[in-house]
Amino acid sequence: YLLSAAREMNRNLIRTAYSTIIYEVKDFGVGIYDNQCRLLAEAPGLAIFTRGNDYALKQIVQYLGHENIHPEDIILLNYPYMSAAHTLDVTAAAPIFHDDKLVGFSAVKQHWKDLGQKDPGYCTDTTDVYQEGLLIPCLKIHKRGVLNQDLVELIRFNSRMPENTLGDMNAKISSCITGRKRVEELIDKFGQETYNLAVENILDHGERIARVQLADLPKGTWSAEDWVDD
């Protein structure tokens, strides 16, 4: 069911995004996480994004504190030293609550085309992070379900393509809300205890598979080289 929910997040994002880099290039990652920011389910996308989101989620919790994360919040983060990505890869996180207790997050990391960086599009010759555009350090775009219009306007006035940027932002928000609702429905149906047991089973199963694969590797020291365009 969690995989199905993640795939639904994926479909909603693709169907509602404004940018070709989302609905054609698939430059995004979506996932569902537990309350320790451990990945439980992901949909097809850039795996590095989904892996980076757990780090971003931990930074959000550390920055805001558990006491300042509330039901129906949605938090944006793109500060590279907290989000494990460059500035244009923006994380949105929706905390998931049951009986007023944080049980997890749904999250989307997605490339935005323009946040006022020094050059339109990609700028590969920047010399510091401040040339990459607007920095968003764990700010709430939704506060207890209420849209933060001040932050919307800040983003609007810092983008050369505001309609496109805000359209992609809304697609991301919708995707996060989808994941949040599906997990809430799951817990309502089966109960918190059953959900917690299922989460631990998922993580234990993943660890067992990884250990089996590692055990098949021959003993030795391994290294590799590869090349990228200059």
Residue ranges of predicted features:
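Extended, highly charged
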Residues: 1-16, 36-49, 172, 184
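Short, basic/aromatic recognition patches
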Residues: 1-25, 61, 65, 77-83
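Short, small/polar residue-rich loop motifs at catalytic or cofactor-binding pockets
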Residues: 24-27, 88-90
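Gly/Pro-rich turn-and-neighbor structural signature
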Residues: 26-77, 187-230
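Short, Lys/Arg- and Gly-enriched loop/turn segments at beta-strand edges
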Residues: 83-89, 115-116
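A short, hydrophobic, proline-anchored segment that marks a local hinge/packing element in signaling
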Residues: 89-99, 107
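Gly/Pro-rich active-site capping loops and adjacent beta-alpha segments
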Residues: 102-158
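N-terminal leader/propeptide and maturation segments of large enzyme subunits in energy/redox metabolism
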Residues: 135-209
